[in-house]
Amino acid sequence: MRDMMIQSKKIALIGSGNIGGMIAYLIRLKNLGDVVLLDINDGMAKGKALDIAESSPIGKYNGEIFGTNNYADIENADAIIVTAGITRKPGMSRDDLISTNVNIIKEIATNIAKYAPNAFVIVVTNPLDVMVLAMYRYSHLPSNMIVGMAGVLDSARFSYFIAKELNVSVESVDSLVLGGHGDIMLPLIRYSSVSGVSIADLIKLGMITHDKVTEIVERTRKGGEEIVSLLKTGSAYYAPAESAVLMLDSYLNDKKLMLPCSAYLKGEYGVHDLFVGVPIIIGKNGVEKIVELQLTEEENSIFNNSVALIQNLVANI
């Protein structure tokens, strides 16, 4: 095991593919901590770590980064982001990945429990809501210390599409997407706005039509699939990486950001013992609060359909 001179927080990234490599790079850019990049492909992890390290004199960022295939190197990590798993190919749904990726998550969870039981764990592997529950069950970590990255990404996609349609800065748009990370996610139109002006009011002002909003909702639901079909040999990684790092930053620096994430519900929204996308506050204690919104009858119906789909998917893990 290689010794590290820990200058700050220790962050372990399990999986050094496109998302894992990009997360490692973003962590260095933002100086969030020292990075252990772990992958069963030892050469890939070490190669990407070295490449990122060699960029540090240009980017003027400090801290350690190294690649490994040894789980002992994640010992006492403060935070862990899991991206390992097979990715979608054209024609595949996220759900097609279940059996293979559950076995991968099981091995990872066992090693996290052994070497870093106090870490805050962010799961990115798809199908997200299934994998984060598998992580919880096999690692036995407290539920407040495990979350899934989904809603941040879905909300970002929705915000981007709205911004492009209205020809406004993406910085002006706030949006919120709940439910499962898939075709039955729930973009909450009434909680989405442009510089404080609700989407409903923008429709009344004639700046966007209801049909166009509906079209954007559907495109958001198919956002990952759209990128998979274009890339043909992989799935999205820039936006997922940014999303995971935003969550990580909120935890490490106790920012207490309210973010839509897949969190363990114990009766909130009428759901028990499942990870579902809802607004949460992430701080130094992990998931510090689950924000329970009052949904309309229509919203609740879509949300419950999303929950039912997740329940079916997790039945055999």
From Swiss-Prot:
Q: Record's SUPFAM superfamilies? A: LDH C-terminal domain-like, NAD(P)-binding Rossmann-fold domains
The family database entries (Pfam families) matched by this protein are listed as: Ldh_1_C, Ldh_1_N
Give a yes or no for keyword Transmembrane in this entry: no
State the EC number(s).
1.1.1.37
List the keywords (alphabetical): NAD, Oxidoreductase, Tricarboxylic acid cycle
Q: Where does substrate bind?
A: R88, R94, N126, R157
Molecular function (GO) terms for this protein are: L-lactate dehydrogenase activity; L-malate dehydrogenase (NAD+) activity
Q: Which reaction does it catalyse?
A: (S)-malate + NAD(+) = oxaloacetate + NADH + H(+)
Tell me the domain of life. Bacteria
According to its UniProt entry, one GO biological process term is: tricarboxylic acid cycle
- Please list the residues that make up the active site: H181 (proton acceptor)
Could you tell me what this protein does? Answer: Catalyzes the reversible oxidation of malate to oxaloacetate.
| Entry's family note | Belongs to the LDH/MDH superfamily. MDH type 3 family.
The protein depicted here goes by the name Malate dehydrogenase
